[in-house]
Design a protein with these regions (language model features):
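Mature extracytoplasmic/periplasmic domains
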Residues: 255-315
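Periplasmic-binding protein-like
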Residues: 102, 186-194, 232-256
Length: 340
């Protein structure tokens, strides 16, 4: 009952415009619609400041170091249990907030936050391959695009430096399952990645413009980011590797040491409104987890090949869990070697 009263109190403040504070959001770069923030500020009177990060590990390390001043963070699902176990997140009980009724039922009882006691959906998507079809006309639904690159693409490949995504794709390419500790599979993964890297131009995050301008021709990227590339260059296509590819969800969480706790809870409730979730998707070009948001979405998102997974490739997409620490250590060793 205490949780219900607290949530009701926060919502009453929001409705009455009684906030006079601020909200500090720590989120992935180029991932937050300015229109969403403007709407939230107009409705609540809360001044929002956004700080960017480029990886889950960067965000986790920054917050663990302390003195950050952030209220909200948006981790990927595989990292949420880590944030919770480290005691970094507040149990804000989104399941008792007014707009929780809008959450799509399939996103409620998730492995990383059963019943949604800590987090609310921000965006969900896939990690696959991006190819400029002007320079390559072969099969793009394969991780061989970056793991055994065709001659035409060598030297023009960029791989996002997100260990979880790249390792899962390489493991599934060799017939393994996410979070495997099979030494034979991991030996093949290590050799394949090291050999493939000589054909990559880089391992960077902020590459949307480089793909659009054709400085890059292929690589590993997220579906929404690739969608935004295609809007600038129609030759760009997104592939779903038939060997397997990661599914993921980023969620809004409130930090336990947030100075603006009520404001942060109000933001969690705010993004569960369908029209607000649609604003997030409109900008970032990913799906969200809020039922009814489709009615407010741009028309081109409803049929986009980066959003609508081909029927024959749906079954090979996997939501991988949080790997055991010992397994994660094996992956980290491979990843560290790849950075040399």
């Amino acid at each position: 009952m205490r949780h219900v009263l607290a949530a009701a109190s926060a919502l009453a403040l929001m409705a009455g415009g009684a906030y006079a504070k601020e909200l500090n959001i720590y989120n992935w770069g180029n991932y937050t619609n300015p229109k969403l923030i403007e709407k939230f500020e107009a409705e609540t009177g809360i001044k929002v400041t956004i700080t960017d990060y480029d990886s889950n590990d960067t965000a986790l390390a920054k917050v663990k170091a302390g003195g950050h001043g952030f209220d909200i963070v948006v981790p990927t699902h595989t990292y949420v249990p880590i944030w919770i176990s480290e005691g970094l997140l507040a149990e804000t009980r989104p399941d008792q907030m007014e707009n929780f009724k809008n959450m799509d039922a399939k996103w409620v009882d998730v492995d990383w936050d059963p019943g949604r006691h800590y987090t609310v959906p921000w965006q969900w998507g896939t990690t696959g391959v991006v190819v400029n079809t002007k320079y390559y006309s072969g099969d793009i639904n394969t991780s061989a695009i970056f793991l055994d690159p065709p001659e035409e693409l060598r030297g023009k490949i960029n791989v996002v430096p997100e260990m979880g995504d790249v390792m899962v794709m390489a493991i599934m390419y060799h017939g393994g399952e996410p979070c495997t500790d099979d030494k034979e599979v991991l030996k093949k993964v290590h050799e394949t990645l090291v050999n493939a890297k000589q054909h990559w131009l880089g391992m960077d995050y902020g590459n949307l413009e480089k793909f659009a301008k054709e400085d890059l021709w292929a690589g590993v990227n997220w579906n929404g980011s690739t969608f935004r590339m295609r809007l600038q260059n129609e030759a760009i296509a997104y592939g779903y590797p038939k060997e397997g590819y990661p599914l993921w969800m980023d969620s809004v969480a409130v930090l336990k040491d947030a100075k603006n706790m009520d404001e942060a809870k109000a933001f969690q409730n705010f993004v569960m409104a369908p029209e607000n979730a649609a604003l997030i998707s409109e900008f970032a070009r990913y799906a969200n987890g809020i039922a009814g948001s489709e009615a407010f979405m741009p028309e081109d998102m409803k049929t986009a090949p980066e959003i609508v997974i081909p029927e024959e490739l749906k079954s090979v997409g996997k939501f991988n869990g949080t790997c055991a620490p010992e397994t994660q250590a094996l992956y980290t060793r491979i990843w560290t070697d790849l950075q040399k």
